[in-house]
């Protein structure tokens, strides 16, 4: 049986795309995934160009694959994702043993590219932007648990001064309304209970509705997804404050399947830096969104993204970021030191802040957010949380784990329940009382009496 090894860098969109690469190759050639590159007939790197380290890591990994290619000339080596889109044929020039190079919008052409490489003996490069056609050529999604990702749009049209995404994934293009609903319904029929709607900027979604001229905005899409039988929870990422509309805020009042958790990247706490980033909103406007959401959902947890050390960032600018962190009380953050990306406007800005200063700022920021995350977890001890059971605990397979609405993993034991009955709980919603908070998980006891034998604690 032929096998494919896929290494994924970067965001959840890339995770989704990697799953689709595996689906496409399985449907076309019967390839099955492997975790061992030495066993693979096809090795793919799904790349990220958001930060320089991620980009260089790709070429480092390619160097290690070179020996495998030398031992097995029939091995197919491919590079996809945003680095592929940005670098194109120069990847082959730098690593001549690479067979195929493809972008995020052309992953559906992967079998054709591999076939052309085998027939012609020449490397194949396709990093074009054929809009949204890839979704018309993808096989049905494979379900591997009660949660699933569904891409609703591609690209970004915001052109933040530091970001390469518009250049590597193209402009915003939304999937048709009915196509998204059909994919979610198909997943629900296979046992999926929670969907995460994906896009570089999901709240810019504007999907075609049938053969009409009407368009569905993101709030309407959320409303219809919530009506699909079997779907219990809806998450989404990533959203942009500039397009967080009043309709979307109101959805939190009417749509109870939207979880009490939101990832809303702010990037910085200084208006001066936000303007240099071309983010299109002020700190006050961002805080207004959070205030309105918390008026509707007082317990909603907020996660975000921060960039530290953007060109021109002063101590006063960073202090404003810390003020925002304390005021909002973030539950989590993806925080990074600014990494200049070639071809972006910010790459030309003067930057005289020492790296050591940036590193100290990042450590201070992340330590503060980590402490707040721990405080929130401790505050959950004694509460009863509704969790979606996802499968066996990673540390103890005899136990189960689930996830709370605010995205925390809860491990729990059911020692009196036979293993077969425990397995049947995967995909079910259970109430658990949180009894202990750990740095990266919670411990709970089941409190719900169920007809399938789960006892009350």
Swiss-Prot record:
One of its GO terms (molecular function) is N6-isopentenyladenosine methylthiotransferase activity. The keyword Nucleus does not apply. PROSITE patterns: MTTASE_N, MTTASE_RADICAL, RADICAL_SAM, TRAM. Residues 142-375 form the Radical SAM core domain. [4Fe-4S] cluster 1 binds at residues 11, 48, 82. Keywords: 4Fe-4S, Cytoplasm, Iron, Iron-sulfur, Metal-binding, S-adenosyl-L-methionine, Transferase, tRNA processing. It is an enzyme of class 2 (transferase). InterPro entries: Elp3/MiaA/NifB-like_rSAM (IPR006638), Methylthiotransferase (IPR005839), Methylthiotransferase_CS (IPR020612), Methylthiotransferase_N (IPR013848), Methylthiotransferase_N_sf (IPR038135), MiaB_methiolase (IPR006463), rSAM (IPR007197), rSAM_horseshoe (IPR023404). It is found in: Cytoplasm. Residues 2-119 form the MTTase N-terminal domain. The keyword Transmembrane helix does not apply. Gene3D superfamilies: Methylthiotransferase, N-terminal domain (3.40.50.12160), tm_1862 like domain (3.80.30.20). [4Fe-4S] cluster 2 binds at residues 156, 160, 163. Its cofactor is [4Fe-4S] cluster. Binds 2 [4Fe-4S] clusters. One cluster is coordinated with 3 cysteines and an exchangeable S-adenosyl-L-methionine. Disulfide bonds: none annotated. It catalyses: N(6)-dimethylallyladenosine(37) in tRNA + (sulfur carrier)-SH + AH2 + 2 S-adenosyl-L-methionine = 2-methylsulfanyl-N(6)-dimethylallyladenosine(37) in tRNA + (sulfur carrier)-H + 5'-deoxyadenosine + L-methionine + A + S-adenosyl-L-homocysteine + 2 H(+). Pfam families: Radical_SAM, TRAM, UPF0004. GO terms for cellular component: cytosol. Its EC number is 2.8.4.3. It comes from the Bacteria. Residues 378-448 form the TRAM domain. Catalyzes the methylthiolation of N6-(dimethylallyl)adenosine (i(6)A), leading to the formation of 2-methylthio-N6-(dimethylallyl)adenosine (ms(2)i(6)A) at position 37 in tRNAs that read codons beginning with uridine. Belongs to the methylthiotransferase family. MiaB subfamily. Monomer. This is tRNA-2-methylthio-N(6)-dimethylallyladenosine synthase. It comes from Ralstonia nicotianae (strain ATCC BAA-1114 / GMI1000). The gene is miaB.
